[in-house]
Structure formats: structure tokens, C-alpha cells
A protein has these predicted regions:
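Substrate-binding/catalytic cleft of secreted carbohydrate-active enzymes
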Residues: 341, 351-579, 587
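Secreted/periplasmic carbohydrate-active enzymes, especially glycoside hydrolases
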Residues: 1-354, 366, 374, 395, ...
Length: 594
């Protein structure tokens, strides 16, 4: 049953929490219809809705504030109990000026199996909880009057589906939290001509001062595709091509005398972005226009160092699970995301490792603008099977392609701490699976580093990422000061965990400590790593000692501190769940800058 909430609470949720922004700044169209807001909602624990015709005759009594899941306060429901099937319903009308165009229904994310009906007609389904997807609903809509949109989301507690930090038990445990069911990112409509731009993959090359555009279009032979590149409002390049096939590739020289250095690079210190507009014309009429942007930056590895724009970069990252108290995995607003980014930078970190969450694209957009580095990490499965392999691989490839153009993303992390591959140390099948994901990732993105198993038991990784929650700085330093015993698998670095899986060895990759710290203040409930501290002075002493120990290791090229905020029962954040600083931000910065 739905938790009873009074009208005042529901109205407050709808008024306070709204997602009105265009959901994908990397591929923005000016004309769109936001479907966020109040929908009708129902639980279907007995899975009887399809049999009983709910899709054709929706009669749901409860309101829900989309895109917030029923588990959140922001939804207006706020019930943590797991429900395997949930239904949504709302109406929409086609604007008069859009009649005659294709009607595309888009979901930025919905967890886990999403089924869609329009006016009682089944449209299709999507499997996966993190990637965006869409349906062409043109043939099912009425051009005048109201259209009925019905959505069913099916979730489970299966460990074969990528679930990240969502619990698979009825209660929270360890570092796993309340599940995330159904629509959790923006839903919207776009109205497009049959001739349209489907996608553009943008690959910068700072060594040749050029950028490669991989276009995917639906166009006839008499169409023309224009690309206009500008920087800070000044046009840098413009060119046109005649599409002679659905997929085309063009490389463009970006050197321009309009700019002081002829080309502007993207970096944390100077996050320069080029704006780009793509226009598709049919018979000299603009039939589609998309706005995007890109950053000229390069990520590479040489001599045990990660290079950004051909220069070594020491990464000081913060583990960020992307949870909010009242909205959980759904960011409450642009302002909330920007607050996290600005506080991260204010503490002297230059990036985040988005842990077990594929983040909202508007967060990535803000990182692109602010110069905050991002490691993008897949949500884990927790058992190994053919089904898990298929689920994981499909969704990971979707996410890589969806997030490829963001310059702030500099590392891909498909696996963490052997989750989903629990016997990887010796199991050849599990080892081979991680290798296959590595090479598939490289086939889509040859440049960015891929960390196959963040924490331990690496197979093939471009960065050797190790986790260690030792709370005494001197002990931490002594463990790592001579790198060979750990990197040659002579000794484990984390209890019984070794750096490499059996049969694999160190090849000179960069080494980073990618989880450490996790210090919690004394708390009557919840947990952190190691002994809890009572005062700011105790916290800073430990933080300084363990951070300085890592920075004193000449072969270690960076670190990831756990973590930015408290998350439910895990209370080891530098900020509380409501983003109140536990320690003065400048004092954390002083240690990071030291």
C-alpha cells in the first residue's frame, strides 16, 4: 500500500522539487516538452496490471512527482518498502505548431525494465536502469485532444542486474542503501522532422589542433548538414557537407587567428569550451538544429604518469556517490549539483570519482564548465552469470556512448572491488569477462584510461587503483614506500586482497590510492572506516597524516578520499547529507594543497 501523505506534504514536494532544465546539454534542441511534474501512480505487487488492462484504462489514485522515485520524500510518497512493479500515467497534447512532425518520447533514465503505452497501444520497452532511451510514438498519438501516456516500471532484487549501491535486501546493510525504482530522471517529448540529426560523436585532437565529428543522421540526398563552431561568441569554423549516407566522419582544423593562442585547451585551470551548432537543411529550410559543445583536451599515459594535455597531472579526487537526502539518486536541481561541485573545488580537490552511479548529464555539463575532473564508474552487478554479463555489457556500452563527449570525464571504471566478479583472482571466465569489457571500452574510446577493477585484483588496467583504509599515516607510508612487494603480488595490500589477479602482473602503469580515509565523527548510529573521531582537531590530524603519507610516495600519482557526503547509514562524509560542512572547507584545502 502507498504510504499515506497529506495534501500539504504532496504539494510541498511538487513545489519544492522540480526538474525543469533541458536534460542533455550536450545535444540540446530549443523546442521540447517537459513531462516532469505530477503524474498518477500505483503499486502493483501482484503484477496484475497488464492482465487487468491498466495500460488501456488507467485509474491510479495516488500522485507522484516525477522524476523522483516513490522511495524519496521529493516524490510526495516517501516509502522505502520494495515494490517490484509500479505504474505511472499522465496526459499530454500535441502543440498545434508541432503537428506533422515525428513525436519522440525520451527517458533520461528509468530503473529497471520500462514499458510504455500511448492511448492504449503498446510502444515498447527498455531494459536497464542508467542509460537514456527513447521511442517514436508518432503512430499512436492523437493530433488533437489529450493523449494518455502509461508507463510500467519493473524492478527486482536480483544481483544479475546492474544496481550499484541499491540494496537487494529489505533493509539497508553495509554500504548499500534504499533501492531506486522506476523513473528517476527527466521524461520529455521532442517533435522532429523525418530528416534529423540522431547523434554526433566529438573527438578532439590537441596534437593536430583538430576535432573529428562522427555524424549519425537521417537525411535525403538533397539535404545539407552545417556545422558552426564558435568560441566565446566568435565563430571559429563553419562548413557544410551533403549527407550521402547515415553515418559520416569529418575532421576539422580548429586553428584560428581570432584567438590569442589560435586554439583553446580544456583543463581544470582553464575549462575552455567550444560551442557547436549542427543544422540540417532540406531544400534550404532548416529542419533540425542541435546545440552542443566540446573541450580540446587529451588524456594519455606515459612513464607511469597520467598526462592531461601532454603534462603530468596529480589527481586529488573525492569519492562522490551522488545521493541527496530527500531525492536520493535524482539530483534535486542544478543549484544542488553546482553546490557539490563548488564545495569539492573549495576543499582543494580537482575531481570526483562518481562511485557506482552513472551521473545526471547536467552534473557532467557543470563539471565541463567548472573544470572538475570526473571518473565515470558503472553500477555493479553482484553475482556472475551469463545473464549478468549480458545486462552489464549492454548498459555499459550505452553509457559510454552517451557520455563520450564530456571533456570532464577522463577515466572509465567498469568494475569496483571485484563486485560482480567475486572469484576473479583465479576464475578464468571472470578474468576474461573483465578483459572483454576493457577491449570493448577501448574500441569505443581509445584515449581515456580504463580501470578494469578499481581497488584490487586487476587484470588489465591502464591505472593500478588500490584501496586502503589504514588510519595511521606512518603505517600507510611504510606499507607502500617500496612499491615492488605490492605491485609484484608478493604481499596483499588490503587484508587478503592482492593488487593483481592470478596470472597478471604490473606493466609500469600509473598507481593511485583510489579509496582511503572514510573518517567518521562519533555518531550514535551509522559507520565510517577505522576509529571514529570526536573533534575537528582529531579529524584534521588523521586526515593530514594519511594524506601526507600518500603524497610522500613518489610513484603514486594521486588519491581518492572517501567521501564527499554522508549517505544514509554511512556517515563518513566531509559534508552531511544536507551539505553542511563538518570541517571548515579551507582547512581541508590546506592539506590537499600542502
Amino acid at each position: 500500500m502507498v504510504t499515506k501523505t497529506n495534501d500539504k506534504t504532496k504539494n510541498a514536494a511538487t513545489t519544492t522539487y522540480k526538474r525543469t532544465e533541458y536534460p542533455r546539454p550536450q545535444f540540446k534542441r530549443d523546442a521540447w516538452m517537459n513531462l516532469n511534474g505530477t503524474w498518477k501512480f500505483a503499486f502493483d505487487d501482484d503484477n496484475k496490471g497488464e492482465r487487468n488492462g491498466w495500460a488501456q484504462r488507467p485509474d491510479f489514485a495516488t500522485d507522484i512527482n516525477v522524476p523522483f522515485t516513490y522511495e524519496t520524500k521529493a516524490s510526495g510518497i516517501g516509502e522505502g518498502t520494495f515494490h517490484p512493479n509500479v505504474w505511472y500515467n499522465r496526459t499530454f497534447s500535441i502543440p498545434e505548431e508541432e503537428v506533422g512532425k515525428r513525436v519522440i518520447l525520451r527517458f533520461q533514465a528509468s530503473d529497471y525494465v520500462t514499458k510504455v503505452w500511448v492511448n492504449g497501444t503498446y510502444i515498447g520497452d527498455h531494459v536497464g536502469g542508467n542509460a537514456a532511451f527513447s521511442f517514436d510514438i508518432t503512430n499512436a498519438v492523437q493530433l488533437t485532444g489529450e493523449n494518455q501516456l502509461v508507463v510500467k516500471a519493473e524492478d527486482s532484487q536480483s544481483c544479475y542486474q546492474p544496481r550499484g549501491k541499491q540494496r537487494w535486501k529489505d533493509e539497508n546493510f553495509g554500504c548499500w542503501y534504499v533501492q531506486n525504482t522506476g523513473i528517476w530522471q527527466t521524461v520529455w517529448l521532442e517533435f522532429l522532422h523525418p530528416e534529423r540529426i540522431d547523434n554526433v560523436k566529438i573527438t578532439p585532437n590537441i596534437d593536430t589542433n583538430s576535432v573529428v565529428f562522427d555524424y549519425s543522421v537521417q537525411a535525403f540526398s538533397d539535404c545539407k548538414l552545417e556545422t558552426i563552431v564558435s568560441f566565446e561568441g566568435k565563430q571559429v569554423k563553419q562548413f557544410s557537407v551533403t549527407p550521402d549516407r547515415a553515418n559520416m566522419t569529418f575532421e576539422v582544423d580548429l586553428l584560428s587567428d581570432l584567438m590569442e593562442w589560435r586554439v583553446a585547451h580544456w583543463s581544470p585551470e582553464h575549462p575552455h569550451l567550444y560551442d557547436v551548432t549542427f543544422r540540417l537543411l532540406a531544400n534550404d529550410e532548416v529542419v533540425d538544429e542541435v546545440h552542443s559543445y566540446f573541450g580540446m583536451r587529451k588524456v594519455s599515459i606515459k612513464d607511469g604518469q597520467v598526462l592531461l594535455n601532454n603534462r603530468p597531472i596529480y589527481q586529488k579526487l573525492l569519492l562522490d556517490q551522488g545521493y541527496w537526502k530527500d531525492t536520493m539518486l535524482t539530483p534535486p536541481s542544478d543549484e544542488a549539483m553546482l553546490e557539490d561541485i563548488e564545495k569539492t573545488l573549495a576543499m582543494g580537490f580537482n575531481g570526483v570519482r562518481k562511485h557506482q552511479k552513472l551521473e545526471d548529464e547536467r552534473f557532467l555539463y557543470l563539471c565541463d564548465k567548472k573544470g572538475l575532473l570526473v571518473w565515470s564508474e558503472m553500477a555493479a552487478t553482484y553475482e556472475f552469470s551469463d545473464e549478468a554479463i549480458e545486462n552489464f555489457t549492454k548498459e555499459w556500452l550505452e553509457i559510454m556512448q552517451q557520455h563520450y563527449n564530456h571533456p570532464s570525464i577522463i577515466t572509465w571504471v567498469p568494475f569496483n572491488e571485484s563486485w560482480g566478479v567475486p572469484n576473479i583472482f583465479q576464475d578464468k571466465k571472470q578474468q576474461t569477462f573483465t578483459e572483454s569489457i576493457y577491449y570493448l571500452s577501448k574500441s569505443i574510446d581509445a584515449e581515456r584510461p580504463v580501470i578494469v577493477n578499481d581497488g584490487w585484483e586487476h587484470t588489465i588496467s591502464d591505472i593500478i587503483a588500490l584501496h586502503d583504509y589504514e588510519e595511521i599515516g606512518k603505517v600507510l607510508y611504510e606499507r607502500y614506500k617500496v612499491k615492488e612487494p605490492i605491485l609484484n603480488n608478493e604481499i596483499p595490500h588490503n587484508n587478503h586482497k592482492y593488487a593483481f589477479a592470478d596470472g597478471y602482473s604490473y606493466k609500469g602503469q600509473p598507481v593511485m590510492i583510489t579509496e582511503y580515509g572514510g573518517i567518521a565523527f562519533n555518531h550514535e548510529s551509522g559507520w565510517g572506516y577505522g576509529n571514529q573521531v570526536n573533534t575537528e582537531e582529531e579529524f584534521l590530524e588523521r586526515y593530514r597524516n594519511i594524506t601526507d603519507a600518500i603524497k610522500a610516495l613518489p610513484y603514486v600519482t594521486g588519491y581518492v578520499y572517501t567521501q564527499i557526503t554522508d549517505v544514509q547509514q554511512e556517515v563518513n562524509g566531509l559534508l552531511t547529507e544536507d551539505r553542511t560542512a563538518k570541517i571548515a572547507l579551507e582547512k581541508i584545502k590546506e592539506v590537499n594543497d600542502g
